[in-house]
């Protein structure tokens, strides 16, 4: 981890970087440039990737003048009259701002309390050792002229400000530092400190921890046992240089000194606000890249970070397990990427957080949101504690949203909208490209975070991330628009638009592919997914509305025979159009897949379609005979008739990895398909219950009531179906993420999860393709480029 003084330096390591960013931003607004401009843009693109790759390997963090000042106050263990770290004093003398303060240049205007605290700490350090009188006077002048900010409610209060700042003013008096402050405001500050101390002195573990964290504001009120019980293996208290320095000043301790020396050995003559923070910073980078849709460019670098994080997880590293945001992020990112991590540490941490207002600063809504997102990743039936905590965190977020004031440790972040979306659309109903676009459009340039003082890091976010993600999104989208035009031509060429009974859902079918399989190299998989989506819609409508029993049987017979003369063997024009489109499309996908797989796959695709046709025919016969199946009979047929097989299964052959005959006949393959399809069928049945009852169709809700003797309500039946969906969805995700005993390649398994997310989104509000919200996201993913303003 390296230090930077100014957050502006994070983005200006190369002057050409700004020129590149500015140039390409303009090009996104005005269209494709000439060849020369394209070359420049390409060079800039590659340079940006290199900078991000470098950033993944390291962690950069801003200097904390506040923490450096407290370290500078530490006396030598050999003489209380000499500083232990004179280099820190020299750094303070060299880094005062022109206005007399000690603050990062270009700091946020709402951080005046932070600047006051940092400046006062620096003045105290210089005064304590009797150096820099002129610097002290300028600092005092700044404090006196900006003192009113300490009482302004609109200003952001760093953690512990009401305790620490008044205590430092007391210390200033002890050092005979003459501060001419407005008496009424000073008394108000002292009164607030008294109230804060009284509120926290109830001897509970969480309050004790909080007061230990703000040790520099406790002075003689500190208790040795209460403070030092929080010392970590590295010698620090809470990985905070300022807390550790204050604790050492009050209670000299060799391990505290070892920690401070190690920090200065790593960073030189100034320290950050938190150390170590490498794991969290690197995970933030990985999470940023994933959420912006550009992680595929850095797979090797990300793999290195994840492997190292997993090693630290298994070792019980305190940097992970003693910090709520880091633990939550590590759990979510590792589990999401298939690492075998138990939920025990996260549930234990959450238990402590719910019994503690301090642990991990859970009152910060960013921490709460991070914990909520982690708690969503429930994979196993025995993770009941995690499930309960997920509901508690959800309630906590809802309460925060309804309150007048939301405390956030991150500046410039549209946290209200982020929380609302997380509550409305859980991760299993949020499609990748929708997530990417939302994160790009609401991207937060201000990478400042706030604890006892503000700090910033390019790992939290920077312009390189935004530039690369916008360029990637728009370039992929241009490919997607062309593919959709190709799909529309295919519909006309195959005369599918002539089938008046059939819904025309071309854009929606393509959207479900583009929103999940968005990389340019997955074009064949997208087109297979979309074309088969259109065809399954047509066939479904043919069985429901457009075809007679004779026509349906004829269609099945044609697919069984395959090599037939359509001019003589088709019983109607509708059958001819449908079969011809099916055959043409299956052969095309089969040819492309066979080249990639180096074996023939066409017969397997035909079999997949026959399974669908047989299941649809069975439902037709049940309806004709007025047969009421058992629940088991219904599900065993309905998951196939839901028609996801022809959409997902052929596409597996086109995403890259080789799939052997053994793989596609393995139980894992079938389980993934059945779990995905059952979720989809039950989601459809819950949302479409009223409509399907009116149409005389079979539906899981009334069938479940009938199979239970009619003794349960429709609401109870729907609740049971939702529980079944949840169980199947979690099992599906577990199989997708499982690597150790898996037969199928992960990139193939992910298609089942992608489709599951599509279904959960499509059925989140309305019955299928009817939601206005869905129309908006289709436009956003396929038609509307992102324009940087």
UniProtKB/Swiss-Prot annotation:
User: What does the note under cofactor report?
Assistant: Binds 3 Mg(2+) ions per subunit.
Task: Give me the residues that bind Mg(2+) 1, please.
Answer: 540, 544
What superkingdom heads the lineage? Answer: Eukaryota
Q: Where does Mg(2+) 2 bind?
A: 540, 544
Cystine bridges: which residues? none
Q: Which GO terms describe its molecular function?
A: ent-kaurene synthase activity; magnesium ion binding
Annotated tissue distribution: Expressed in leaves and fruits, including trichomes.
Q: Please state the pathway this protein functions in, per its UniProt record.
A: Plant hormone biosynthesis; gibberellin biosynthesis
Q: What SUPFAM superfamilies does the annotation carry?
A: Terpenoid cyclases/Protein prenyltransferases (SSF48239), Terpenoid synthases (SSF48576)
What subcellular compartments does it reside in? Answer: Plastid, Chloroplast membrane
* Keywords (A to Z) from UniProt: Chloroplast, Lyase, Magnesium, Membrane, Metal-binding, Plastid, Transmembrane, Transmembrane helix
Q: What class of enzyme is it?
A: lyase
Q: Which cofactor does it need?
A: Mg(2+)
Q: Name one GO biological process term.
A: gibberellin biosynthetic process
Quoted from the entry, the domain comment is: The Asp-Asp-Xaa-Xaa-Asp/Glu (DDXXD/E) motif is important for the catalytic activity, presumably through binding to Mg(2+).
Identify its protein family. Answer: Belongs to the terpene synthase family.
Protein name stated in the entry = Ent-kaurene synthase TSP4, chloroplastic
Q: To which species is this protein native?
A: Vitex agnus-castus (Chaste tree)
Gene this protein is translated from: TPS4
């Amino acid at each position: 981890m390296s230090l930077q003084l100014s957050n502006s330096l994070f983005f200006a390591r190369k002057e050409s970087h700004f020129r590149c960013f500015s140039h390409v931003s303009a090009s996104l607004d005005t269209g494709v440039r000439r060849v020369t401009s394209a070359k420049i843009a390409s060079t800039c693109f590659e340079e940006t990737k290199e900078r991000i790759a470098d950033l993944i390997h390291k962690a950069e963090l801003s200097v904390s003048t506040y923490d450096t000042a407290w370290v500078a106050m530490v006396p030598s263990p050999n003489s209380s009259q000499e500083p232990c770290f004179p280099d820190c004093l020299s750094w303070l003398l060299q880094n005062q701002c022109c206005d007399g303060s000690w603050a990062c240049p270009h700091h946020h205007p709402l951080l005046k309390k932070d600047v006051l605290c940092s400046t006062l700490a620096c003045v105290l350090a210089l005064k304590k050792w009797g150096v820099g009188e002129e610097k002290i006077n300028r600092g005092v002048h700044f404090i006196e002229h900006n003192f009113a900010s300490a009482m302004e409610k609109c200003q952001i209060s760093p953690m512990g400000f009401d305790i620490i700042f008044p205590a430092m003013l007391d210390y200033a008096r002890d050092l005979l530092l003459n501060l001419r402050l407005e008496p009424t405001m000073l008394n108000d500050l002292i009164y607030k400190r008294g109230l804060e101390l009284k509120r926290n002195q109830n001897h509970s573990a969480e309050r004790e921890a909080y007061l230990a964290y703000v040790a520099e504001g406790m002075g003689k009120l500190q208790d040795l046992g209460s403070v030092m019980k929080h010392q970590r293996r590295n010698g620090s208290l809470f990985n905070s240089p300022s807390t550790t320095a204050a604790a050492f000043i009050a209670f000299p301790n060799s391990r505290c000194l070892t920690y401070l020396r190690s920090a200065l050995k790593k960073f030189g003559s100034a320290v950050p606000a938190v150390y170590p923070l490498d794991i969290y910073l690197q995970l933030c980078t990985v999470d940023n890249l994933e959420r912006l849709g550009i992680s595929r460019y850095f797979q090797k670098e990300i793999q290195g970070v994840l492997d190292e994080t997993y090693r630290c997880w298994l070792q019980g590293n305190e940097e992970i397990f003693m910090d709520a945001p880091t633990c939550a992020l590590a759990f979510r990112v590792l589990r999401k990427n298939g690492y075998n991590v138990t939920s025990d540490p996260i549930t234990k941490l959450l238990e402590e957080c719910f019994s503690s207002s301090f642990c991990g600063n859970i009152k910060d809504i960013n921490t709460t949101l991070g914990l909520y997102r982690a708690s969503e990743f429930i994979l196993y039936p025995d993770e009941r504690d995690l499930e309960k905590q997920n509901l508690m965190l959800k309630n906590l977020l809802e309460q925060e949203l309804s309150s007048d004031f939301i405390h956030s440790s991150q500046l410039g972040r549209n946290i209200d909208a982020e929380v609302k979306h997380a509550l409305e659309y859980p991760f299993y109903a949020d499609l990748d490209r929708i997530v990417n676009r939302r994160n790009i459009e609401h991207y937060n340039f201000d990478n400042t975070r706030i604890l006892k003082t503000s700090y910033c890091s390019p790992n939290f976010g920077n312009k390189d991330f935004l530039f690369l993600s916008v360029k990637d999104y728009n370039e992929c989208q241009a490919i997607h628009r062309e593919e959709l035009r190709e799909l529309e031509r295919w519909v006309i060429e195959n005369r599918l638009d002539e089938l008046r009974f059939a819904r025309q859902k071309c854009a929606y079918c393509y959207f479900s592919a583009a929103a999940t399989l968005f990389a340019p190299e997955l074009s064949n998989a997208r087109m297979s997914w979309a074309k088969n989506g259109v065809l399954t819609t047509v066939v479904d409508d043919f069985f429901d509305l457009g075809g007679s029993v004779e026509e349906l049987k004829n269609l099945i017979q044609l697919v069984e025979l395959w090599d037939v003369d359509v001019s003589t063997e088709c019983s109607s024009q509708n059958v001819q159009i449908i079969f011809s489109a099916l055959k043409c499309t299956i052969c095309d996908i089969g040819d492309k897949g066979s080249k990639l797989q180096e074996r023939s796959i066409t017969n397997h695709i035909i079999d997949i379609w026959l399974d669908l046709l047989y299941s649809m025919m069975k439902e037709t016969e049940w309806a004709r005979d007025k047969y009421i199946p058992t629940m088991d009979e219904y599900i065993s047929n309905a998951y196939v008739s839901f028609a996801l097989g022809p959409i997902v299964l052929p596409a597996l052959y086109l995403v890259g990895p080789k799939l052997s005959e053994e793989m596609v006949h393995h139980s894992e393959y079938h389980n993934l398909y059945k779990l995905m399809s059952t979720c989809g069928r039950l989601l459809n049945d819950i949302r479409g219950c009223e409509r399907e009852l009116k149409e005389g169709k079979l539906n899981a809700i009334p069938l479940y009531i009938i199979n239970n003797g009619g003794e349960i309500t429709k609401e109870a039946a729907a609740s049971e179906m939702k529980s079944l969906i949840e169980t199947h969805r979690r099992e599906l995700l577990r199989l997708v993420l499982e690597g150790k005993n898996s037969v199928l390649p992960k990139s193939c398994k992910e298609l089942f999860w992608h489709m599951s997310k599509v279904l959960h989104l499509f059925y989140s509000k309305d019955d299928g393709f009817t939601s206005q919200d869905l129309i908006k996201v289709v436009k956003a993913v396929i038609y509307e480029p992102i324009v940087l303003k």
